[in-house]
């Protein structure tokens, strides 16, 4: 198996956004539901959402205040970790996500060998994630990940979103 030298060729922009949007609807996060799809070089597709790690209890206390930041895994890392659990190689993979990656997810995307990322534009004015997006954009670019900006709303039928 070889890694495609042009990771953008395999998927037109937004090809997996509908799948990522569908995955986001499974998120227990009460503030923001995020979905991600990782497509490995061998064609394996892994859809994930921001959620509690496997076996970790979902209870009220863990949703309170900043609890979701402590207890929940982000969709991008959830997809990467699921690939690792299944023994799916991520070198040269393509990731589509419904929300621009944070710093931690950007590092995971780079270090797992993801080659291309389809994502909505970063909301630099977001009060929680804006500053993180500035840094994650640098990490992704310097890490060699091709970033393609996709409007998540365009993928949903009739312009409706699942979050």
Can you name each region flagged by the protein language model?
Residues 1-163:
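Zinc-dependent deaminase catalytic domain
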């Amino acid at each position: 198996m070889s890694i495609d030298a042009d990771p953008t060729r395999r998927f037109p922009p937004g090809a997996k956004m509908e799948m990522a949007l569908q995955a986001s609807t499974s998120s227990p996060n009460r503030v923001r539901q995020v979905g991600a799809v990782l497509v490995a070089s061998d064609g394996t597709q892994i859809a994930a959402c921001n959620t509690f790690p496997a076996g970790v209890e979902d209870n009220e206390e863990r949703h309170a205040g900043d609890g979701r930041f402590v207890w929940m895994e982000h969709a991008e890392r959830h997809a990467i970790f699921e690939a690792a659990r299944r023994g799916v190689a991520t070198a040269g993979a393509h990731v589509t996500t419904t929300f621009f990656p944070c710093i931690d997810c950007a590092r995971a995307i780079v270090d797992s060998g993801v080659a291309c990322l389809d994502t909505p534009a970063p909301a630099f004015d977001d009060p929680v994630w804006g500053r993180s997006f500035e840094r994650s954009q640098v990490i992704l670019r310097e890490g060699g990940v091709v970033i393609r900006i996709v409007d998540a709303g365009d993928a949903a039928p009739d312009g409706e979103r699942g979050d």
